[in-house]
């Protein structure tokens, strides 16, 4: 009985698999946290998500990262290109948001430089941070993003593509290698409003 409970009736075998299944079955609302970034004054994340009525694909990163964050940036560059090449109807748009979990270092100016380096189009892809450390921790905890300082000024962290709806709820989690699936799901959700 314990194995059945731990694996959601033998549907998943990892903690990440369990997270994905749990989110798909029960969307997770973002906590009350504020974000800021280049062109984004301090504002509630939930309000920003709801403001444009669009579906948002989110990743978590930090600008000093020289490993997985660069891969995530490359994935978002490809997703941005696809969004530019295949625009959707107004009101059914998808956008991208990179959130730094290193808010004390990643100031809006540093995020702006990083965005320029990646060729981010601010109409489609924005960068932000959660300026309050306690709020950042609450957001990471709620969305089950694991970030561990490595003792050398860097971080070990999991990486995924998180799809959030216009109500500010995490509705799906995709592996970084599933970028096409994540974007197609986000577009479907934007067009139909159904998870």
Regions found by a protein language model. Give the residues of each.
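Generic structural signal for well-ordered beta-strand positions
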Residues: 43-46, 171-172
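Short, acidic, Ser/Thr-enriched surface-loop or helix-capping motifs
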Residues: 37-39, 164-165
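Thiol-/selenol-based redox modules, centered on thioredoxin-like
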Residues: 150-195
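Short active-site neighborhood of thiol/selenol oxidoreductases, capturing the structured segment around
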Residues: 45-76
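Structural micro-motif
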Residues: 123-125, 137, 141-150, 154-162
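N-terminal targeting signals for export/organelle localization
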Residues: 1-36, 192-195
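Short loop/turn microsegments at loop-to-beta-strand junctions
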Residues: 30-31, 55-56, 158-160
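Structural microenvironment flanking redox-active thiols in thiol-disulfide oxidoreductases
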Residues: 72-139
């Amino acid at each position: 009985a314990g194995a059945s409970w731990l694996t959601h009736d033998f549907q998943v075998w990892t903690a990440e698999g369990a997270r994905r299944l749990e989110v798909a079955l029960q969307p997770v609302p973002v906590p009350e946290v504020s974000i800021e970034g280049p062109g984004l004054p301090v504002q509630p994340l939930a309000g920003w998500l709801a403001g444009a009525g669009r579906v948002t694909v989110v990743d978590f990163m930090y600008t000093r990262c020289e490993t997985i964050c660069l891969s995530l940036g490359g994935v978002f560059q490809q997703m941005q290109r696809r969004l530019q090449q295949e625009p959707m109807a107004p009101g059914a748009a998808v956008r991208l948001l990179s959130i730094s979990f290193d808010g004390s270092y990643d100031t809006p100016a540093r995020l702006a430089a990083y965005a320029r380096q990646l060729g981010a189009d601010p109409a489609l892809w924005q960068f932000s941070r959660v300026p309050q450390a306690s709020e950042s921790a609450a957001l990471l905890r709620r969305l089950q993003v694991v970030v561990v300082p490595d003792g050398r000024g860097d971080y070990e962290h999991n990486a995924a593509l998180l799809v959030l709806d216009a109500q500010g709820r995490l509705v799906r989690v995709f592996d970084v290698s599933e970028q096409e699936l994540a974007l197609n799901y986000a577009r479907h959700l934007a067009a139909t409003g159904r998870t």
